[in-house]
Amino acid sequence: MPTVNQLIKEGREKIKKKSKAPALQGNPQKRGVCVRVYTVTPKKPNSALRKVARVRLSNGIEVTCYIPGEGHNLQEHSIVLVRGGRVKDLPGVRYKIIRGALDTAGVANRRQSRSKYGAKRPKAGAAQATKGGKK
């Protein structure tokens, strides 16, 4: 433990917060171009084919991004908007693609949590038909 004189002379060292999404360089989102779109298998207790894309960001950094939601229209050379946020069961995937922005289409027929998947609000008649005409 330092003495009062040592603290006056040196001061305490600030703990630097390490960024969880360093490729974004402090920005909330970054634009990028898909270099490769493919699937990967998750870590041990889970089993699936998760859709991911290798994206070259506008700052030149290349990152692996998760494509959320069911189905997507992405292919090589698609322009995408990338945000931070890791996928727990995919090692090395620390970014997500924003659905409904730039070349990425929103999720079709999405009824709940629509804003997270870039889905437009369904028409009133269509919503009634899918629910089975409840009054």
From Swiss-Prot:
Residue ranges with Low complexity bias: 124-135
What is a single molecular function from GO for this protein? Answer: tRNA binding
- Please give the positions of the paired cysteines in each disulfide bond: none
Biased composition (Basic residues) is annotated at 111-123
Record has Nucleotide-binding as a keyword: no
Q: Which organism is it from?
A: Hydrogenobaculum sp. (strain Y04AAS1)
Q: Which GO terms describe its cellular component?
A: small ribosomal subunit
Q: What is this protein called?
A: Small ribosomal subunit protein uS12
**In the record, what lineage is assigned to the organism producing the protein?**
Bacteria, Pseudomonadati, Aquificota, Aquificia, Aquificales
